[in-house]
Amino acid sequence: MCDEQDLARWAKGKLSRRAFGGSAMAAGVAACTPIDSTGDMPEASGGLSEGMVSFAAPGGTMDGFFVHPSGTRSPLVLFWPDIAGLRDSKRQMARRLAGEGYAVFVANPYYRDVAGQQFEDFADFAGNGGWDKARQWRSKLDAEAIQADARAATGWLDTQDGVDRSRGIGTQGYCMGGPFTVWSTAAVPRMKAAASFHGGGLVRDDATSPHRMLREDAHYLIAIARNDDAKEPEAKVTFREAAEALGAEAEVEVYAADHGWCVPDSPSYDEAEAERAWARLLATYAEAL
């Protein structure tokens, strides 16, 4: 999981705003048009409908970016971003997944404190006090809060025309969003797949540790950064053993890349390993949803 030392190093090195890689941005760039909570969404490029949405949730008014194939119903995916929150790189990732046939909601995890996008990209987050701001917002996001948010989000999204309610739901998360996927799956019975990419805190010493909240009928894709694994090499073993004891299907793997490798605006982005992880995500959803 990224920490203050990482952010200080990236900021001191004048982290550049990297151009998005071609394959990661294959869905193309479309404008993010704000819309109201009725779900009336404008047409975007590539046969997708997209926009910002908002709805009532336990912590106030939850908002996020919703994109789905136009004119059809698709399996729902709840997308939890990393510590830098909702921003263009996450919208682009959501568009790419929607292009594969999914209705994708990128949550603003900090809606209890702020609405919408707070940072332009990871460089903006790392260089302009993002850690100090996000640390306060993130402190409210325990298992109980995330589970309440997951229930609220999926409940509202299930009322939207673009969502196929007969299919299972997937959830994916990055960095701090990794454990959110397991908590969400524990809270929403129709969630059938949880994918964590360079997620932190998947094994903890409390009752709400994600490895203690697995479901027998769900699929788990746990993609671990090599530098995170070096800090906690036993965590992958503990998670895998917990899944095996329950009989849950879990793919747990350490990738040959550092924390943040899946996110195009991260200083650790590794296109080859990101594409490999993306392929495993699609395979997991194809099997489970």
Question: Could you say what each language-model-derived stretch is?
Answer:
Residues 249-289:
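C-terminal catalytic histidine-bearing segment of alpha/beta-hydrolase fold enzymes
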Residues 38-69:
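N-terminal cap/lid segment of alpha/beta-hydrolase-fold proteins
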Residues 151-210:
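Primarily recognizes the serine-hydrolase "nucleophile elbow" in alpha/beta-hydrolase
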Residues 1-15:
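N-terminal secretory signal peptides
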Residues 15-30:
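N-terminal export leaders
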Residues 200-254:
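The feature captures the conserved acid-bearing segment of alpha/beta-hydrolase catalytic domains
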Residues 74-82:
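Short beta-strand element of the alpha/beta-hydrolase
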Residues 122-170:
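Gly/Ser-rich "nucleophile elbow"/oxyanion-hole loop immediately N-terminal to the catalytic nucleophile
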